[in-house]
């Protein structure tokens, strides 16, 4: 089972438009029989997990939340498997490592750190360009000379679906 890493803004920074995009994206990911691995909290992570769980294609264990604290109860209600780490923001590396590919939308400092981790381990990031934030800012760029073409700009859910088919 391929795992899609979901990174983006938390509850405070996630606009209604981005949240709705996340729900639709989650529904499409569920239809492709892929699992989600994310930070397990609110905002964009919750939206994608909600879309997965609302899909007729969902299955138990499809949404995995790698939590920053020590309490599984802090996970959003759409997480099937909550993994409390007690590591704070260091859990960002675990999310990136656990995923086969990353989808980034919007994002602040946490998303930036996850994109940087993905770059360092040469993991592809589909950077949604429809919303302001680090995903849009870094789409199509190289962070340094160690790799090329890992931050792939995507302008629609249909483009994301194309990548998921070939994953």
Question: Regions from the language model: what does each represent?
Answer:
Residues 1-16, 26-27, 31-32:
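Generic N-terminal amphipathic, Lys/Arg-enriched alpha-helix
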Residues 3, 35, 62, 124:
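Residues at the starts of beta-strands that form the adenosine-phosphate
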Residues 23, 30-33, 42-116, 131:
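Acidic/glycine-enriched connector segments
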Residues 82-86, 147-163:
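Short acidic-hydrophobic, aromatic-tinged amphipathic segments that line or gate anion-handling sites
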Residues 101-103, 122-125:
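Structural loop-to-beta junction motif characteristic of Rossmann-like glycosyltransferase folds
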Residues 124-150:
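Nucleotide-sugar donor-binding patch of glycosyltransferase catalytic domains
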